[in-house]
């Protein structure tokens, strides 16, 4: 796994508010932390996303990537830009960009290729892109999906690895992340911010849902 948290990349994240600290955040996993990676702040700025995706594409030989796959929603943007920069370096042919979607009903929440995209996977070299790796669970689903359709996963390229996700967590696929952050997180019952009465941030993360659930529990 490549880690190169150089000052320029960290500054790009910080300048748009993509790394926020000194607050009390609740993650989608239910764990708490004082730091939050606000990936949505990046997507507001096409120039920043473009530059970051160029860096995400750099480690790969353009002719060796047939299709870039990203999970919805952020992965759609990333797959387009990364494929764009791979195509700029290709001498012939074209790198395609597709995305995987989750089932809409309450039973099927697994990723799937819709819109006929599955036809472009078999026997192809696939690069999977993701914005933030936390547990690797979503990306592992996409890896399994690509393999199910006969594709060969060359690598995973991410904006940020905040969960120390390793190749073994994602089907033994090499990981390249622009930045890697080792964030201290806590279960609710051991969270020092909860114990100190630090207000939960309701603007970022799952703070509002956490507070709503607490209120319901105390009714």
What is each residue range found by the language model?
Residues 1-64, 205-219:
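Active-site-facing substrate-recognition patch
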Residues 2-12, 143-219:
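PRPP-dependent phosphoribosyltransferase catalytic core
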Residues 54, 58, 80, 84, ...:
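Short, well-ordered alpha-helices that flank and scaffold nucleotide-derived cofactor binding pockets
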Residues 62-63, 79-95, 169-180:
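Short acidic, glycine/proline-enriched helix-loop-strand junctions
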Residues 64-73:
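Short glycine-rich phosphate-binding loop at a beta-alpha junction
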Residues 69, 98, 127, 154-157, ...:
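Hydrophobic/aromatic beta-strand patches that form the interior of the parallel beta-sheet core
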Residues 80-127, 214-217:
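Short, glycine/charge-rich flexible loops or terminal/linker lids adjacent to PRPP-binding catalytic cores
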Residues 112-155:
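A contiguous pocket-lining binding segment that forms or flanks enzyme active sites
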């Amino acid at each position: 796994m490549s880690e190169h948290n150089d000052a320029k990349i960290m500054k790009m994240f910080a300048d748009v508010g993509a790394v926020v600290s000194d607050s009390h955040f609740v993650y989608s996993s239910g764990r708490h932390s004082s730091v939050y990676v606000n990936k949505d702040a990046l997507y507001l700025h096409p120039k920043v996303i473009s530059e970051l995706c160029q860096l995400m594409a750099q480690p790969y030989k353009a002719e060796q990537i047939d299709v870039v796959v990203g999970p919805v929603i952020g992965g759609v943007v990333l797959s387009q830009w990364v494929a764009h920069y791979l195509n700029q370096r290709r001498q012939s042919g074209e790198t395609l960009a597709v995305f995987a979607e989750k089932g809409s009903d309450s039973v099927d929440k697994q990723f799937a290729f819709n819109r006929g995209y599955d036809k472009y996977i078999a026997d192809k070299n696939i690069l999977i892109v993701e914005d933030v790796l936390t547990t690797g669970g979503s990306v592992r689903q996409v890896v399994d999906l690509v393999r199910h359709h006969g594709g060969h996963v060359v690598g995973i390229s991410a904006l940020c690895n905040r969960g120390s996700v390793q190749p073994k967590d994602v089907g033994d696929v090499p990981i390249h992340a622009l930045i890697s952050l080792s964030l201290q997180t806590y279960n609710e019952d051991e969270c020092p911010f909860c114990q100190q009465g630090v207000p939960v941030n309701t603007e970022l993360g799952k703070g509002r849902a956490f507070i709503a659930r607490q209120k319901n529990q105390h009714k």
